[in-house]
Design a protein with these regions (language model features):
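Short helix-onset patch at the extreme N-terminus, typifying the N->h transition
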Residues: 7-8, 45
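Short hydrophobic targeting helices and cationic amphipathic motifs
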Residues: 6, 22, 28-31
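Surface-exposed, charge/polar-rich loops and edge strands
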Residues: 28-432
């Protein structure tokens, strides 16, 4: 048995873009009865009935009119999302994930009539996201391939008109790459970038649990109003409720706004198939954080689970850099179970952040890039995040475990209330 003390934490949880929001203020307690080995957590203990009619298939007409559930020391109340600033402490820092969803689904029709879908996961050559979208003539991606057996290795072709130019996109299978496939794309013309290709030919991926085809409206509604950096294949949906008006209210309320970039991968939809969480392989995601965010020492409010994973990963990144100041930036990575290693050094959160700032000063960089595989489950000791805005998540998901860890296991009362009070769930649902 281990005793883990979680600091006084206010949690604001806002589910997704068009439904009900939830603000959680949770005073996390001493977890004296927590299992030493968090890997033994049974995912079946985090199940709940979610009828299909509770899943929001489309957003509300106005983003900020979704419901907001507020949880404060076991007390639950409701509001509308556009009033969120009134529930936040002045002088806090709210962290947003500014990633932008790309049109990652490409469809090719073989001469035989077979339809092949190529779902872009992660850039391979070039590996840098910004360079990838600017590249011309050729690039390679790690992908999921639908109907792979029907491909049989032939070159796939598809023509499209871009900027008045007839462009033929060619796709060639290279090799299997762990759980994905390496695909090389090529096309003629120095004036057509891969970003142009996706804009003209790609389809926006929406969550599979919506059980519908992507519509033209999703190109707008499945992006946050502050999205900037292309790279995600799924939206950071806690941010979908924010409007320019809400952001202005936050500014007027004295809330500092900072942005990080975490490109959300398809792994966010990966179900937990093992009985115990220790058997689940958490997906890895790439992160970019600016120096200004690290220098802001205000109380931290995370918008969404991607922001939580980013911010909490910073603590463990600081531990690494405190121990070894010469690590190459390309090798900076947080392993899945790293936070639960009781033998690692202990630093105060600000000391860990200072180690990152010192590293950045020595390297003369204004942003730091790294990847994280961190999994946050009950028993996790939150280091930096004090409030959380998030969605209502799927049963038996790693995201639900993250929320449970944040509210000291009281997730059932929150979700029972939401289910019985007409809250809308998942990506286009409400917020908490």
């Amino acid at each position: 048995m281990q005793t883990t003390y979680l600091p006084d934490v206010d949690s604001l949880v806002i589910p997704s873009r068009h439904g009900i929001h939830q603000v959680i203020k949770a005073n996390l307690k001493n977890l004296s009865n927590m299992e030493t080995d968090v890997k033994q957590i049974r995912i079946s203990d985090y199940n709940y009935p979610l009828p299909d009619e509770k899943i929001a298939k489309f957003p509300l007409a106005k983003r900020d009119e979704s419901k907001l559930l507020i949880y404060n020391h076991g007390k639950i109340e409701e509001d509308i999302f556009h009033n969120i600033s009134s529930h936040l402490p002045k002088g806090a820092m709210m962290v947003f994930n500014n990633t932008k969803v790309i049109q990652a689904r490409l469809h090719f029709r073989k001469d035989t009539g077979a339809l092949i879908e190529i779902f872009l996961l992660e850039p391979h050559t070039p590996a840098d996201y910004e360079q990838m979208f600017q590249t011309t003539r050729e690039c390679s991606w790690l992908c999921i391939v639908g109907n792979l057996k029907k491909w049989k290795g032939q070159e796939l072709k598809r023509e499209v008109n871009i900027k008045g130019i007839c462009v033929t996109l060619r796709a060639n299978y290279v090799e299997e790459h762990h759980t994905s496939h390496l695909i090389r794309f090529s096309w003629d013309g120095d004036k057509v970038s891969f970003a142009d290709i996706l804009e003209a030919m790609g389809e926006l991926p929406i969550p599979p649990y919506l059980n519908r085809e992507t519509q033209e409206s999703d190109k707008t509604t499945y992006q946050t109003v502050y999205s900037k950096i292309k790279g995600s294949v799924a939206a950071p949906t806690a941010g979908l409720h924010f409007t320019d008006s809400v952001l202005s209210d936050l500014d007027n309320h004295g809330i500092d706004r900072e942005e990080i970039t975490l490109h959300v991968g398809a792994g966010t939809f990966k179900p937990v198939k093992s009985e115990e969480i220790g058997g689940h392989d958490m997906h890895s995601e790439f992160i970019c954080v600016h120096r200004s965010t690290l220098e802001n020492d205000c109380k931290t409010i995370a918008v969404g689970t991607t922001s939580v994973r980013t911010i909490e990963s910073l603590y463990y990144l600081g531990l690494k850099l405190h121990a070894d100041k010469e690590i190459e930036e390309s090798k900076l990575h947080i392993e899945q179970w790293e936070p639960y290693d009781e033998n690692q050094p202990k630093l105060k959160p600000q000391e860990a952040i200072n180690a990152i700032l010192d590293y950045m000063s020595a390297k003369r960089i204004s942003t730091i890039h790294f990847s994280t595989q961190i999994i946050i489950v009950p028993g996790y000791d939150y280091k930096i995040v004090k409030m959380l805005v998030t969605n209502f998540h799927q049963p038996q998901s790693t995201l639900l475990l993250l929320v449970s860890a944040f509210v000291n296991g009281d997730w059932k009362s929150i979700y029972d209330y939401a289910l019985s009070h007409e809250f809308r769930f998942l990506s286009y649902g409400d917020s908490s």
